[in-house]
Swiss-Prot record:
The lineage of its organism: Bacteria, Pseudomonadati, Bacteroidota, Bacteroidia, Bacteroidales. HAMAP family: FTHFS. Its EC number is 6.3.4.3. It comes from the Bacteria. One of its GO terms (molecular function) is ATP binding. InterPro entries: Formate_THF_ligase, Formate_THF_ligase_CS, P-loop_NTPase. This is Formate--tetrahydrofolate ligase. ATP binds at T64, K65, A66, G67, I68, G69, K70, T71. It comes from Bacteroides fragilis (strain ATCC 25285 / DSM 2151 / CCUG 4856 / JCM 11019 / LMG 10263 / NCTC 9343 / Onslow / VPI 2553 / EN-2). It catalyses: (6S)-5,6,7,8-tetrahydrofolate + formate + ATP = (6R)-10-formyltetrahydrofolate + ADP + phosphate. Belongs to the formate--tetrahydrofolate ligase family.
């Protein structure tokens, strides 16, 4: 089979205005970024049409280093739905350069289920990430300048919370010292970099309903505390307007196309392990304005992306998914059943059977939100008929729908069975109205503990002294009603990335809290999760090159 990039190049792309017209977007509302990419103004969203559209969330079992293929299934489902005559649009997150050149590779799907032009989407795309990076670091520069220019007046901050961001994986930038050298270089202080998808600006962009809301949220960003313990925000800095200007184009959803020429919105890109892991509300609602069926995905496993999709994105936007599809693979389940990474392609029914406990736990969790759930088995070449039959029988016993997805190899044709099951399930047994894990009025600790005990399976949650002090501060600031966003490893229900399966009765330790006052959520950091990833021993960058003007090795 051809590589992803070879398949992408073999597709004859439609002009983006043609794609826009095919779903009902007027040509004069399309802002071209080249021939095959466009931005669509957010004012085209029609809330009445949004209410009538069928929103489908695609999530997955707990992530493994073997990969699950959630984005490929999301795109494949959209292709399959279009194949059976439904007007379906997929709404995804934008890829980050860090993982693209690091361990994970690109994030535009795979095989014959991709969003295109793949190379541009995986690299600089429409510049949204660069705009977010610039906006975030502009705040850093303006804050440092404010402190420098006003130090003679006796002004200073007791604690500076605002760090810097960069869209690369670089462990050496996690903790730095700025302002070294002569006094004219600014005030010497500790700082550090997070990766751009972890930026509060990214979360704000993805949760904003329009430019005015974007500006309001930017104004509320908490930068630090004065010596008399008063919060110091972007509003105090007086630059919310300038920062909003840097994001005025980035807020508009991006329109591209799939390998079969159908519409796709790709916009926003927070990670689900260190942020809330969902594409922008605006892109989802734009897709729902023009599509009868809209497929969106949330990052990593259902314990991370799906939980945050429901408890944060849906809570803030009023979105109500009609169905949740959970992606499972034989290889991933075998890893959760104790099979080593180097042996997961070998037949192993016992390992697969043991790994099903991970799937079961996710399905129970999804049901707790009132969701109707179906399982999409993402087929790999090494999968056996016996393994697929075992999973089918297990889903039957669970009382959840099951379909095989082979869109990677066959495009939309390989997802027709899944598409038919999705339509049939939505028509006969759609999800109930969302039942959130916690209430707005619950305390921060109650929210964290409800997620940790009810969804992760923790028996106890412990807090560092730093965390307890910040929780007290949150209560004093009157923002305890914000939802919580737990940052933890994607490889386990626990905070230990080496504990696979369906672990229960463990201690979850919250070592720190980050107050995202602009994004209006509380980020609780569990375990040793890093908001700036490092590169692996053999980064993907070693395999990427350009030969005769053509990019190679991008996947």
């Amino acid at each position: 089979m051809k590589s992803d990039i070879e398949i992408a190049r073999s597709v004859e792309l439609k002009k983006i205005k043609q794609v826009a017209e095919s779903i009902g977007i007027p040509r004069d509302e399309v802002e071209n970024y080249g021939r095959y990419i466009a931005k669509i103004p957010e004012y085209l969203i029609d809330e009445e049409k949004v209410k009538k559209s069928n929103l489908i969330l695609v999530t997955a079992i707990t992530a493994t280093k073997a990969g699950i293929g959630k984005t490929t299934v999301s795109i494949g489902l959209a292709l399959g739905l279009n194949k059976i005559g439904k007007k379906a649009i997929v709404a995804l997150r934008e890829p980050s350069l860090g993982p693209c050149f690091g361990m994970k590779g690109g994030a535009a799907g795979g095989g014959y289920a991709q969003v295109l032009p793949m190379e541009k989407i995986n690299l600089h795309f429409t510049g949204d990430f660069h705009a977010i990076t610039s906006a975030h670091n502009m705040i850093s520069a303006l804050l440092d300048n404010y402190l420098y220019q006003n130090q003679s007046k006796g002004f200073g901050l007791k604690e500076i919370l605002w760090r810097r961001v960069l869209d690369v994986n670089d462990r050496s930038l996690r903790n730095i010292v700025v302002g070294l050298g002569p006094k004219t270089n600014g005030i010497t202080q500790e700082s550090g970099f997070d990766i751009t998808p972890a930026s509060e600006i990214m979360a704000i962009l993805c949760l904003s309903k329009d430019v005015d809301d974007l500006r309001r949220r930017i104004e509320n960003i908490l930068l630090g505390y004065t010596y008399d313990n008063k919060p110091f925000t972007v509003k105090d800095l007086g630059v919310a307007g300038a920062i909003t200007v840097l994001l005025k184009d980035a807020i508009h959803p991006n329109l591209v196309q799939t390998t079969e020429g159908t519409a796709a919105f790709v916009h926003g890109g927070p990670f689900a392990n260190i942020a809330h892991g969902c594409n922008s509300i605006l892109a989802t609602k734009m897709a729902m304005t023009f599509g009868d069926y809209v497929i969106t995905e949330a990052g990593f496993g259902a314990d991370l992306g799906a939980e945050k999709f429901y408890n944060i994105k849906c809570r803030k936007s009023g979105l109500q998914p009609r169905l949740t599809v959970i992606v499972a693979t034989a290889q991933g389940l075998k890893m959760h059943g104790g099979v080593s990474l180097d042996r997961i392609k070998e037949p192993n029914l016992e390992g697969l059977r043991e790994g099903l406990r991970n799937l079961d736990k996710h399905v129970r969790n999804l049901h707790s939100f009132g969701q109707t759930v179906i399982v999409a088995f993402n087929k790999f070449a090494s999968d056996t008929d016996e393994e697929m039959e075992l999973l089918r029988e297990h889903c039957e016993q669970l009382g959840v729908g099951y379909a095989i997805n082979n869109a990677f190899s066959e495009g939309g044709e390989g997802a027709v069975d899944l598409a038919n099951l999705v339509v049939e399930t939505i028509e006969n047994k759609p999800s109930e109205p969302l039942q959130f894990t916690y209430n707005d009025e619950d305390s921060v600790q109650q929210k964290i503990e409800k997620v940790a005990t009810n969804l992760y399976g923790a028996s106890v949650v412990t807090y560092s002294t730093l965390t307890r002090n910040k929780i007290k501060l949150i209560e004093e600031m009157g923002i305890g009603h914000y939802p919580v966003c737990i940052a933890k490893t994607q490889y386990s229900f626990s905070a230990d990335p080496k504990v696979y399966g369906a672990v229960d009765n463990f201690e979850l330790h919250i070592k720190d809290i980050v107050i995202n006052n602009g994004a209006e959520m509380i980020v609780a950091i569990a375990g040793e999760i890093m908001r700036m990833p490092g590169l692996p021993k053999e980064p993907q960058a070693l395999h990427i090159d350009i030969v005769d003007g053509n990019i190679e090795g991008l996947s």
